[in-house]
UniProtKB/Swiss-Prot annotation:
Binding site for Zn(2+): C249, C252, H269, C276
Name of the protein described by the UniProt record: Death-associated inhibitor of apoptosis 2
Family of this protein: Belongs to the IAP family.
Organism of derivation: Drosophila melanogaster
Cross-referenced InterPro entries: BIR_rpt, IAP, Znf_RING, Znf_RING/FYVE/PHD
Inducing factors: Constitutively expressed. Up-regulated by bacterial lipopolysaccharides (LPS) in Malpighian tubules but not in salivary glands.
CDD domains on file: BIR, RING-HC_BIRC2_3_7, UBA_IAPs
PROSITE patterns: BIR_REPEAT_1 (PS01282), BIR_REPEAT_2 (PS50143), ZF_RING_2 (PS50089)
């Protein structure tokens, strides 16, 4: 959903007409962080990175959830330069054009190097080239030789001969997101990332089913094994919900049912949930595009599967099980979250108070005794970078959000992908070491290519920014930290060993 005008906060706010007043997060907070309502219950989508979030809980900070779900979104990295138009900047007269405030940049595309370079038209300092400064994330302020970073708002002046723009940027502002991306990579929007083959990370909605074996165990009483084998469904990211032939994706939470013998699980999954990150990682964007093209060509045919129906938690909060739980002193947010989980997992409501309480206790890891749980602690908000002006003669580093840890550079990780695969291939054809038996050599070569999580499939995903090739396509979505170095995973690149 990328309708024209969604860069305007007022347009995005209009999509929240049916947003519940007692929702865990307010429509205003969502709009201010780039989201619009999709119309699918509590689901909201970011206009700038297209990440979707629907499992909101009381105490959530929208900016923090957005940063965790899509750390390279332009709205997260540079909200003042991503093209977002706050309501305060819109004209009071309907139909008039939007006027930028003095603090905002007249060109909302300064995240692009070419547009930054244009600002150096009258650059006065011959000690360093405009190309080097633009590459390092700076644009010219038209004042002496002062340049400003689009990402961290840091300002540097008094450039000297032989200065390296990126190294100076790194020295004064080491936590700047542009610095952490590395000198060789230019900022890319979601579309550019797709073209580069980089897939941002999103957390699975049902992480306990991220493992294929865990999904397979749910099919113990699968009723139509003669029509659809459980193994094929589990490989496609689906687990059984113990209701008819209804299955659900562990990652995107799409529900599918009414299976026919000719149905292919991967095809149906991609057809009904083309933005599912698990499908995109396991099968690739080309496969999803092919499925959508085939579906469009056969639009007149009857769909083989249909999304599972859902109910609204608002209505169920007035039912007996919810009212009885509230009467026991259990927090309303806890009850609502339990009901929402039940709807997402099964499409039906709790029939008794006991069933509701069991779900609450299971989720909290509590025992059988009734406990009144405290509301969840609010997440720490993401601290906006502060602006600082730095002269190279006497510099003061800029404070940047503590929540952005220093990581290996993404550019180096991307550049190392081919190097990693080449090394593995060389290992496969290397002359056996005289100190090792042929059997031991073969074992080591095989281990080097095995997924470090399931120890079964061949590795096929490179983690960014660390650059490790450690898991297969199936296991990659289930890990938040690299199994090799424990670094946070910000993105994936599908890799093929030939």
């Amino acid at each position: 959903m990328t309708e024209l005008g969604m860069e305007l906060e007022s347009v995005r706010l209009a999509t929240f007409g049916e947003w519940p007043l007692n929702a865990p997060v307010s429509a205003e907070d969502l709009v201010a962080n780039g989201f619009f309502a999709t119309g699918n219950w509590l689901e909201a989508e970011c206009h700038f990175c297209h990440v979707r979030i629907d499992r909101w809980e009381y105490g959530d900070q929208v900016a923090e959830r957005h940063r965790r779900s899509s750390p390279i979104c332009s709205m997260v990295l540079a909200p003042n330069h991503c093209g977002n138009v706050p309501r305060s900047q819109e004209s009071d007269n309907e139909g008039n054009s939007v006027v930028d405030s003095p603090e905002s940049c007249s060109c909302p595309d300064l995240l692009l190097e070419a547009n930054r370079l244009v600002t150096f038209k009258d650059w006065p300092n011959p000690n360093i080239t405009p190309q080097a400064l633009a590459k390092a994330g700076f644009y010219y302020l038209n004042r002496l030789d002062h340049v400003k970073c689009v990402w961290c708002n840091g300002v540097i002046a008094k450039w000297e001969k032989n200065d390296n723009a990126f190294e100076e940027h790194k020295r004064f502002f080491p936590q700047c997101p542009r610095v952490q991306m590395g000198p060789l990579i230019e900022f890319a929007t979601g579309k550019n990332l797709d073209e580069l083959g980089i897939q941002p990370t999103t957390l699975p909605l049902r992480p306990k089913y991220a493992c294929v074996d865990a999904r397979l165990r749910t099919f113990t009483d699968w009723p139509i094994s003669n029509i659809q084998p459980a193994s094929a469904l589990a490989q496609a990211g689906l687990y059984y919900q113990k209701i008819g032939d209804q299955v659900r994706c562990f990652h995107c939470n799409i529900g599918l049912r009414s299976w026919q013998k000719e149905d292919e699980p991967w095809f149906e999954h991609a057809k009904w949930s083309p933005k599912c990150q698990f499908v995109l990682l396991a099968k690739g964007p080309a496969y999803v595009s092919e499925v959508l093209a085939t579906t469009a060509a056969n639009a007149s045919s009857q769909p083989a599967t249909a999304p599972a129906p859902t109910l609204q938690a608002d209505v169920l909060m007035d039912e007996a099980p919810a009212k009885e739980a509230l009467a026991l002193g259990i927090d309303g947010g806890v009850v609502r979250n339990a009901i929402q989980r039940k709807l997402l997992s099964s499409g039906c409501a709790f029939s008794t108070l006991d069933e509701l309480l069991h779900d609450i206790f299971d989720d909290a890891g509590a025992g059988a005794a009734l406990e009144v749980r405290e509301p969840p602690e609010p997440s720490a908000p993401f601290i906006e970078p502060c602006q600082a002006t730095t002269s190279k003669a006497a510099s003061v580093p800029i404070p940047v959000a503590d929540s952005i840890p220093a990581k290996p550079q993404a550019a180096e990780a991307v550049a190392n992908i081919s190097k990693i695969t080449d090394e593995i291939q060389k290992m496969s054809v290397a002359t056996p070491n005289g100190n090792l038996s042929l059997e031991e050599e073969n074992r080591q070569l095989k281990d080097a290519r095995l997924c470090k999580v399931c120890l079964d499939e061949e590795v096929g995903v490179v983690f960014l920014p660390c650059g490790h090739l450690a898991t297969c396509n199936q296991c990659a979505p289930s890990v938040a930290n690299c199994p090799m170095c424990r670094a946070d995973i910000k993105g994936f690149v599908r890799t093929f060993l030939s």
